[in-house]
Structures are given as C-alpha cells and as structure tokens.
C-alpha cells in the first residue's frame, strides 16, 4: 500500500519500506547502543506511528495523542550522557536521577578530573586534544578546519580566521591546520587592538566535548571540501614573541575622528578573564589613525553635534541651517527670529500657520515665530548704517520686531531719497497670499476685491510723502514685548468679554459668519490709569498683529498741521502690515460734539478718521481692528457712537488687583512687609486707579533714600539702603491721593448703563 501526504504543499509518496528505515540502523532493545542512538530510534517510531499515520487519517486524534504521550515519556526518560569519552567535569560517581522519577538509562559517570586526564603544560594551557582516535579516523585529515565553537563532525569549506596562543619558553603548539590556508588580511588592516597572544600561526581545532553520535560512529560522512582557493592578498606575518601589534594603515589615507568621543576603531577589548594567572592581560595600543574611509572635502563650516530631541521644530531648524550653508534657502528665513512671539499661555488665540511663503514674510509681529505677517518694507537693501539704526534694539530683546526703531525723526526732517523706494509687499508676486494670514480667508468675490484694493493701496502709498511713512514707522508703530492676559491685574470680566465678543469672531470668522458682524471697532472708556492701553496691546499680541498707537491729544496739539495726513498714512501702513491693531487714545478730542467749525483742523481730522474707520468696517479683506479709548465718553457726539460696535467700561482695580499690583512693583526693591501690612495697604488704596497705586509704590520706594544723610548719592551703593517699610507707605499716603472722584465714577456707571455693553 502506498500512501501519500502533503508537506508544505508538496506531494510526497510514502511506502512501508521507508518506515522501516530506523529499525535497519538502530535497535531500541539493544543494550550496546548509546542513549543517543535510542533517541534516534524513538524519533523514527514517532515519525512512523504518529506523524504519518495521523496525516493519512489511519488513526484517530485520540490514538495519536496517546502515542505522542507514550513516546514523549520514553524520549524524555533517556538522559544523554558520555559513553566512552571523559567529560571535563567533576560529577559524583552516582548518576543523577531524573526529576520525573523515571529510570535512568545512561551509563555510570566517571569523574574526569584526575592526574591522568590533565595535560602537562609549561605556561599556557593547550587546547583540548581531539576526542579520540575513532573520531579523528572518522573524519578526513583535511576536514579538521572548524574553528572554536563549531561542530567537529560538520566540515567547513570556508576559510576561517585561525589564531594560536603565543609560545612561552620552548613549548610550541602543534598545528592541525597545516594543510589549510589561514585567514589573511590586507595591508590596510589595523591590528592595534588585536589580542597580544594572537599570531599568524594556525590554531588546532577544538573538538566539541559532545560529538554527534552519527559522526562518531562513522554513519554519516560529509563529502570532502573543495581545495582551498589561493590567497589573493598578501597576509600579515607575526612572530610568536610579540607583546602587541600595531599594523599601520596602508590601503587608505588616515582620517581623524569626526567628533569628540567618536572612535571608528572601536573600544579596546576588556581584560581577558579566561587567561591563566601566569599570563598578563594584553595592553592595547591607542590608535593614531583611523583606516579605511575617505570623505569628500567641502567648504562648509562643521556643524557642532547637538543632542537629539522629539521636537519636529529642531529638525526643521537643522535642515534650514544646512540649506543655508548650501545656499539653497531663501534669505528671508532668517527674519523669523526677530519677530515678536505670541504668548504661550493662551494658545486658543493664536493665528494658525497657513504655509505662507518665505518671500512674503515681513518684519512685523510673527504669527508663531516662523510665519510673519506682511510687512511694509523698502524694495532696495538697507545700507549698513540704516540697518544699525533699524535693528539697534534687537541685541537686547529678541521679541522686539526689527521694524520698530528707538530712533525718533523730527517732524521737519525729510528723507533724501525719493518715495519710490517704498513698495507694498501686497503687490508682490505673492500678493494673493496675504489672504492666508487669518485662519479662514475670505473666498469667492472677496479675492477680486482684495486684488483691486491692493492696487489702490499701492497707488496711494506712492503718492504719500516719505517723511509721513517714516513718522508712522518710527513713532506710531509701538514696540514692546508681547502682553498676556496674566500681565493685566484684575479686569476678569472685561477680559472674558473681549475674548468672547472680539477675539473669537476675528480668529474664527467661519464659525461666526452670518451670525454677527466682526467687531472691528471697540471703545474702551473709564477712568485714566486703569489699563486701557495695556488691553489694546494684549489684543494685538493675541492676534499677532502690529500695534499702532495714535494719541488724540498729540494730533490736536503737536501735529495739528499734519494730523489729517498722519491718520491717512497710518491706515495705509496698517493695511500693508495686516493684521493690525490701531489704538487711538483720547478719541473724545477728535469726535467731540463741541467741534462746530466745518473747515477747522480738528474737523478735517475727524472727517479723515471717520472715513478710514468706515472703510475698515465695510471692507471684507482688511484685517484691521480699531480700538479707541477715552476718559470722557459723554463728550463723544451722539451720532458717532454707532461707529463703535463694542463699548466696554474699564473700572478701577478691585482689592485683588491692587494687591497684585503692589506685590509686582515691590519685587523690584528690597522691602520688609508682613501680611497684615499688605492687607492695610490694600484697604487704604480703595478708590485708587492702577496708575495711582504705581505712583504710591514709587514714592514709598524712595523713602530709604530720603532717610540717608545728606551726602553724595553717587557714592551710595544699593546694598547700603534699608528695606522699604510700612512707614514709607505712610509717608507716601500724605503725598499721593486718588485721582478719581466719586462723581466721575457714578458718571461712568450711568453712561455704561445707557450706551455701554452689559458686563
């Protein structure tokens, strides 16, 4: 009967003659066979009675399970041990029993550590001799080429590296590999860290302490290996008495290490623990050159290695730095580090990055320190003197935009260059990209309207006087670090209203589209010194916008002749630096109902301001927010209140805010106040504005100076001054009084009830 089975998809023919093959070679019941032979016999029975029978459905699953259990028990009951060869161990004469309690079929063990089993040695222990003459005779003489750790029965036809121990005295180790070529190395091989006992002599093969019974009995004989190939490269020659080796690199030019701590040659090997006590551990020579690799020369400056981190931003910076060295990166990339960064404590109000090209980045407030808004900049390169003037303040404050300048130009000064050097970046080849400044740019017809408006802005800029642009850039655009909500003491209700009714509709116009108009104009009214300007700067920081600060009193008193043109130029520059926040203080001086003359300078200023404000309110593409502040809201013309979509009252600071202001101001000085004295200060400053509290703390801080004897103040060191005490505040209360009367406070409350937004 011929049965067939499928193993891994291959059809195999099986006959009973095949099943009888193990019995033709092994006999389980024989008493002369070694345990290893019995194991092979059990494997044959397993294959015949279990695997193939079960595969052909000759037996059931239960029968197969019983057979598997039976032969597994017999298989595990055989303990393979040494038969006719000594074992390098010191076991007892009685063989160990099995854990499962079965009979031990192995032969009694004989201790091998005796005087006859130890080879006499002079200084270095020789390799263990071949197992026996029977094993050696079973293998061809040329087949003893396996290195340490390989099986003596499996001949290798590969040339392996062979080493021999160095000689000590007159003892020479015989070689069993004389007929085989040793592993040879090219002249470029650096042997600085080779073992001191290695040489080019062949190493006798170490036979396995447990040779396979098939090979030891001569049943399986591998074919002889092919003749060894001739050596292609000259080998190195070593003598037997060298203490260490250092082969110079000849194939490749030497190359020094790339960076500190990098060693291409690898670390020297640790001291050998297996060496006899009579032989010292090898002492490696430090490598002087690194062989084998050459690097293409380049003119780039080496980059210092930096620590690896998980920030994607680091990889981008490293990539940008590398590209800068190759000259493939846009030069405008370097502008990102100058821009004013957004506060990290309020990520909800950050403008998202919409992949604005590098060529369209300006020097205004950055969105996230990498994507900046459109900037109004000259087309030609600035001269070194101009660059020093423009960016002189950047060395001390990295958050300040470079477009801000500390130098002030006089009103009568005019630039010697024509206005033609100024062009609007909106009209650049990436002019349409400015629509990506907000998270959700206007779509549809608004794009065509923006293009036409850009042409109009560019034409108006060309017709504007140069010194007006300089005046707006140097004096009206205000520099300063970003302001966060935590920098403003108190005013929690006002902050919440601004966030919900001003910032959210501007930042997420898609979510608020169709529900309400964008609040592009805000009126902040209240007593002086309550933080209206600080709120305007905070809104600009949250929007990532350029902050324009126009003083209404300065327009009327200082710039009365050019106030109309200054307002016009300010809005033009704001359109070029979108998003922008224009803050106008003392707006009551421009919009007062007492202005009656139609052609007066104040009337012309008001007309120009209202025209520009109306353009901002009706424009779909302008990203400009106008914030006006006043301490006299009742003087604003009733017909002009409609221009302000939000009218918010900024009240006096409460007790918590006053405590925060006092602590913040005193941290700059040395003071000695306890909690009770702080509570008294907060109580006595009831009715003070934030500016009044600041004046009080400044007056108290100079108290230690007044207590000093009448000497030269230049010789007094700060450490010589005593701390600020509560008595200094007592003296300051005699000089500083609240600047807001109760009548004014009542007026603000009434006006807020009538015309303000409920808070």
UniProtKB/Swiss-Prot annotation:
> What GO cellular component entries does it have?
centrosome; cytoplasm; microtubule; nuclear matrix
SUPFAM superfamilies hit by this protein: P-loop containing nucleoside triphosphate hydrolases
Cite the residue spans of the region called Disordered. 89-111, 200-237, 258-293, 337-429
Describe the inactivation phenotype.
FIGN and AKAP8 double mutant mice die soon after birth due to cleft palate.
Pro residues: which segments have biased composition? 221-232, 266-289
* Residues found modified as Phosphothreonine: 400
Name of the molecule in the record = Fidgetin
Q: Write down the species.
A: Mus musculus (Mouse)
Organism lineage string = Eukaryota, Metazoa, Chordata, Craniata, Vertebrata
Primary gene name: Fign
